[in-house]
Amino acid sequence: MCVICFVKALVHVFKIYLTANYSYNFRSWPVDFRWDDLHAPSTGNSSQRALTCAAAAAGVWLLHDAALGGDTLTRPPRGARSQVQCLLQQIRELPSQLASYALAHSLGRWLVYPGSMFLMTRALMPLLQQGQERLVDRYRGRRAKLVACDGNEIDTMFMDRRQHPGSHGRGLCLVICCEGNAGFYEMGCLSAPLEAGYSVLGWNHPGFGGSTGAPFPQHDANAMDVVVKYALHRLNFPPAHVVVYGWSIGGFTATWATMTYPELGALVLDATFDDLVPLALKVMPQSWKGLVVRTVREHFNLNVAEQLCCYPGPVLLLRRTQDDVVSTSNHIPSMPSCQVEGDVEGNRGNELLLRLLQHRYPSVMAREGRTVVTRWLRASNLAQETALYARYRVDDEWCLATLRSYRERCQKELDDAEAWGPHGLSFPWFVGQGLSARRRRQLALFLARRHLKNLEATHCSPLEPEDFQLPWRL
């Protein structure tokens, strides 16, 4: 054998070896990081805390019982009549509970998370392996196995740009990507921030690709928890330099992460909804309404809007104007070019924006503000947005000055430490009190335009790198 042929054969064998190293036989892969592997010294910051799963669950139930008015330590015994009524109620609810459980663990899980189906994973395996090869060869991706607090093994891929951050320093910022219900990091939403020059950390839901377990909300949250800890404590990114990007159903884990770790730098939600119930009722028979609502609330309670309002940092919502997946509208066009007025009215991202602005700026969003923002959300293209913006004569400079003046005034008047968070003055802001209705409309439109960006794209269209932007900061 000639020297050249030997070298070619050696390169071929080496490539086969590399492919085997990051193939989907992930069981024998050594554990790189566990949820309790926190080597950084404790500073009292929430990014440094190490709550066990048992302690976290206990805390949740303590709060739940307290909200119901019960004594969690010593609960007095109920009367015999009360116990009988409780038993009868449980017996009456047992059939519906069993039906809900059966639906959630069979058809329900496959509908909510189709990417966890074994047949889909097998069918996509060649594409997933090609995606892994591309990330490793072109972007020097580093694969790692993380273990969550429930024992699930989470498959991750990290692309580090810190050595060559680029002219804008984007590589110093880490984007944690949360995929959709049929998305994998090998061929998912991480391509946009990756091509835009950011450092990127992708991971697969439990039951997706190399990750073990089943993709129920609590398992997803546990997986997200270990991913964030891995980014902060092993990859050593400062919390302020970490951006969480969630696409579609990935908005649940993205908002959970920023709610649990409010010191994280920013949140970007792409084609995300506020609540799963309206979307589930859209695709299921009307006669199943009671069962569907109960199943979603008990087993797939993806309360994205509630979690979003708990995050005090910068937020950007990306709404796709041709999205028929997260829309409850009945007149979505069949062709992308057939845009008609009202196509975006049923997009659940509208409710997400309204909930966010109402929580953060309640005085601005009272009556006139909510009405004008709802009208602005009906605009399905840039021309309609601009026309409505000009109609109300929104003065961006005045809006910025008003918001900054309110913040500076609060800095002088408020001495309470609870009024300040990792991103400055905590929400809600009561700016807008005393302003005229016209000024409140202008301020509401200004805030809506800063928090939501329209994209003329369908739900599954890949996001262009130039469309991935960091949220607006005051």
Swiss-Prot record:
<dbReference type="InterPro" id="IPR029058">
    <property type="entry name" value="AB_hydrolase_fold"/>
</dbReference>
<feature type="active site" description="Charge relay system">
    <location>
        <position position="323"/>
    </location>
</feature>
<keyword id="KW-1208">Phospholipid metabolism</keyword>
<comment type="similarity">
    <text>Belongs to the AB hydrolase superfamily. ABHD16 family.</text>
</comment>
<dbReference type="Pfam" id="PF00561">
    <property type="entry name" value="Abhydrolase_1"/>
</dbReference>
<protein>
    <recommendedName>
        <fullName>ABHD16B</fullName>
        <ecNumber>3.1.1.111</ecNumber>
    </recommendedName>
</protein>
<comment type="function">
    <text>Hydrolyzes the sn-1 position of glycerophospholipids with high specificity towards phosphatidylserine (PS), PS-PLA1 enzyme. Also hydrolyzes the acyl chain of glycerolipids with a preference for the monoacylglycerol (MAG) 1-acylglycerol, MAG lipase. Plays a regulatory role in cellular lipid homeostasis by modulating genes involved in neutral lipid degradation and in phospholipid synthesis and composition.</text>
</comment>
<feature type="active site" description="Charge relay system">
    <location>
        <position position="423"/>
    </location>
</feature>
<feature type="domain" description="AB hydrolase-1">
    <location>
        <begin position="175"/>
        <end position="295"/>
    </location>
</feature>
<dbReference type="GO" id="GO:0016787">
    <property type="term" value="F:hydrolase activity"/>
</dbReference>
<keyword id="KW-0443">Lipid metabolism</keyword>
<dbReference type="GO" id="GO:0006629">
    <property type="term" value="P:lipid metabolic process"/>
</dbReference>
<keyword id="KW-0378">Hydrolase</keyword>
<dbReference type="GO" id="GO:0005654">
    <property type="term" value="C:nucleoplasm"/>
</dbReference>
<feature type="active site" description="Charge relay system">
    <location>
        <position position="248"/>
    </location>
</feature>
<dbReference type="InterPro" id="IPR000073">
    <property type="entry name" value="AB_hydrolase_1"/>
</dbReference>
